[in-house]
Swiss-Prot record:
Protein name: Aspartyl/glutamyl-tRNA(Asn/Gln) amidotransferase subunit B
NCBIfam families named among the record's database cross-references: gatB, PRK05477.1-2, PRK05477.1-4, PRK05477.1-5
Alphabetical list of InterPro entries matching this protein: Asn/Gln-tRNA_amidoTrfase_suB/E, Asn/Gln-tRNA_Trfase_suB/E_cat, Asn/Gln_amidotransferase, Asn/Gln_tRNA_amidoTrase-B-like, GatB, GatB_C_1, GatB_Yqey_C_2, Gln-tRNA_amidoTrfase_suB_CS
Subunit architecture: Heterotrimer of A, B and C subunits.
Organism: Cellvibrio japonicus (strain Ueda107)
Reaction equation(s) it catalyzes: L-glutamyl-tRNA(Gln) + L-glutamine + ATP + H2O = L-glutaminyl-tRNA(Gln) + L-glutamate + ADP + phosphate + H(+); L-aspartyl-tRNA(Asn) + L-glutamine + ATP + H2O = L-asparaginyl-tRNA(Asn) + L-glutamate + ADP + phosphate + 2 H(+)
EC numbers on record: 6.3.5.-
Length: 481
């Protein structure tokens, strides 16, 4: 039997406000436990929440960015459940009247395919605290610094049919919120967390299967692995005649295994009701229009501009525009070097590989746009071959200086002098008379491949510094006479 995977996501986006959603306590990451929790966060008697206006502005920006309806009237509700890191015994969130209504995000997938993922809604809520288990023998600690941090929870429709589509959506959402600067996007610090709802059904069946939820995935890689594992598990259970239990599961990225946490609750289990301490929030058209005017360039608009302004392919433009900092680095390099195509190739190729290898972000890279533009200039004027340019780039990464100083210090200037090249070519021809005869007696169709032998010999003699274009022209001239 052929099976179809059905995936929906719930994404928790931590908003980059300086203070919490209902209190003035700081949201800065990394402070000592319980040093950034005030009386409101601790749920002390007599305290009342005060909504954070910046959180509403950020949520409105997000809604506009995902083509959604903005809720002009939104209501906070209490989601009731007990957990040690939830001091109040309930979470203040939104359900019936969220700030962001139905919207959508368009994806570009491999092979030129496109996919529209519908967003059911997005709502504002407060984050819970954090339970600490590792540093306490036989006990657990509670850190309430995170309690009350503002979140947007984005809930999609079950529109995704593979791990590839789910990861593509997650990456697009990450690109949107970081471009808007409403979230720093640092998943290692919990700034974005993904809950994945997964079910399978026989291909062609309209009715959804029983879903499970895998919670708190904090990387694209873990999301892909967790989906593949859960899909395989569900198919095995069904093909063995079993039934899928609606449950919440937890994936361990170290062991590559998942386990059941608890049975999955429905909304009725949380006994939602309107929060009596908070009035409905009313947003008018003037407010929404003012927020729209403040919005920065979004990834899709940036991609379209890169295609038109720099004549880049849709793929290259998409890769460069996904990250706001990468896009800015590319544009500065392109303007300094006056060569957008070479700039794109180097940013997406050698620079991306270097950042990945050294686990650096482009914002603190040792390679600057000025240094990369200087290297590109030496490629354009023929000073460096593409092969030698990579050696110079490695030296730049190691902090040895700019391209010009490295070329001078190491003597890496490309050999374009006709006299010097002819001398090396003559020596190679003289040393290889049999290969010369074979080349001259060969069919035209075989000659290009045979020419590679002579190119390689001259490159070896020049230590890779011969100008490839000049070398090929001179070799053809000498071998064909």
């Amino acid at each position: 039997m052929q099976w179809e995977t059905v995936i929906g996501l719930e994404v928790h986006v931590q908003l980059a406000t300086k203070t919490k959603i209902f209190s003035g306590a700081s949201t800065a990451f990394g402070a000592e436990p319980n040093t950034q929790a005030c009386a409101i966060d601790l749920a002390l008697p007599g305290t009342l929440p005060t909504p954070n206006a910046e959180a509403f502005r950020f949520a409105t920006m997000f809604g506009l960015a995902v083509n959604a309806e903005i809720g002009k009237r939104s209501v906070f509700e209490r989601k009731n459940y007990f957990y040690p890191d939830l001091p109040k015994g309930y979470q203040t969130t939104q359900l019936a009247e969220p700030i962001v209504g139905a919207g959508y995000v368009d994806l570009e997938l491999e092979g030129g395919r496109t996919k529209r993922v519908r967003i059911h809604h997005a709502h504002l809520e407060e984050d819970a605290g954090k339970s600490l288990h590792e540093d306490f023998a036989g006990m657990s600690g509670i850190d309430l610094n995170r309690a009350g941090t503002p979140l947007i929870e984005v809930v999609t429709e079950p529109d995704m049919r593979s791990a590839e589509e789910a990861v593509a959506f997650a990456k697009k959402l990450h690109s949107i919120v970081t471009s808007l600067e409403i979230c720093d996007g640092d998943m290692s610090q919990g700034s974005m967390r993904f809950d994945v709802n997964i079910s399978v059904r026989p291909k062609g069946q309209e009715k959804f299967g029983t879903r499970t939820e895998t919670k708190n995935l904090n990387s694209f890689k873990f999301m892909e692995e967790a989906i593949a594992l859960e899909v395989e598990r569900q198919i095995d259970v069904l093909e063995d005649g079993g039934k899928i239990i609606q449950e919440t599961r937890l994936y361990n990225g170290d062991t590559k295994k998942a386990r059941s946490m608890r049975s999955k609750e429905d909304s009725n289990d949380y006994r939602y009701f309107p929060c009596p301490d908070l009035l409905p929030v009313i947003l008018d058209d003037d407010y929404i229009d003012a927020v729209r005017q403040q919005m920065p360039e979004l990834p899709d608009a940036r991609q379209a501009r890169f295609i038109g302004q720099y004549a880049l392919s849709s793929y290259d433009a998409g890769q460069l525009s996904a990250d706001k900092l990468v896009a800015a680095f590319f544009e500065q390099t392109a303007q300094l070097s006056q060569d957008a195509k070479l700039s794109a190739n180097w940013v997406l190729g050698e620079l991306a590989a270097h950042l990945n290898k050294t686990e650096q972000r482009i914002s603190n890279s040792t390679v600057t746009p000025e240094l990369l533009a200087g290297l590109i200039a030496r490629i354009k004027d023929g000073t460096l071959s593409s092969k030698i340019a990579k050696l110079v780039f490695e030296a730049i990464c190691n902090g040895e200086g700019d391209a010009d100083s490295i070329i001078d210090t190491r003597g890496l200037k490309q050999v374009s002098d006709t006299g010097a090249l002819e001398k090396m070519i003559d020596e190679v021809i003289a040393k290889n008379p049999q290969q010369v005869d074979n080349y001259r007696n060969a069919d035209d169709s075989k000659r290009p491949k045979m020419l590679g032998f002579f190119v390689g010999q001259v490159m070896k003699a020049s230590q890779g510094q011969a100008n490839p274009q000049a070398l090929n022209e001179l070799l053809l001239k000498k071998l064909n006479t």
